[in-house]
Amino acid sequence: MDSMSKSERVAFAMAELEARYPAPPIPLDHRDAYTLLVSVLLSAQCTDKRVNTVTPGLFELADNPRDMARQDVDEIRAIIRPCGLSPRKSAAILKLSQMLCDEHNEQVPCDFEALEALPGVGHKTASVVMSQAFDVPSFPVDTHIHRLMWRWGLSSGKNVEQTERDAKRLFPESRWNKLHLQIIYYARELSPARGWRIEEDVITLKIGRKAVIADARKIASRRA
């Protein structure tokens, strides 16, 4: 990290991300707010790639709350088993589908409080749905964003709640929905948790914590 101010570092990161990912696609395949909600729920401790291989079979069985609420939980569990945590996730999918039918006219609510009241839906899942399904300014923080905000010296890294507060404070609200996707793609490509090639990570090299860069170079030299 050089003598740049925090606002200059934020501006550099945003410009670099915009240049690399001008139109970042939503990683999870979906058709509407309901299929996105289910896909995000399945993505807990699972890769988006694997979720995208599982959801076609699940949505062939049922792709709306009414039809899903009529399914047997064991059948849902069998289909989603490759995503992991299938007992918990299948129960949540069935229960939230029933709740959408009973309390929300079979519609996914565009409301944080109502979303977080659904079984299996936490703040991050609700934020993804609000951002990607309803285009409501949100900043979902996953492990990738949490890691990069720390590496870039833009958050203390204490917890994801603090990282979200810092991201919302530092980045303009008009950019939140796009930025969180841009950071995820950058993290996966150039600043992963494992197999990190620091010399290719142009943003961290420019604005990152000096100690983080030094440690990464030491690890890279041992691998060489």
Over which residues does each language-model region extend?
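Catalytic cores of DNA base-excision repair glycosylases
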Residues: 2-223
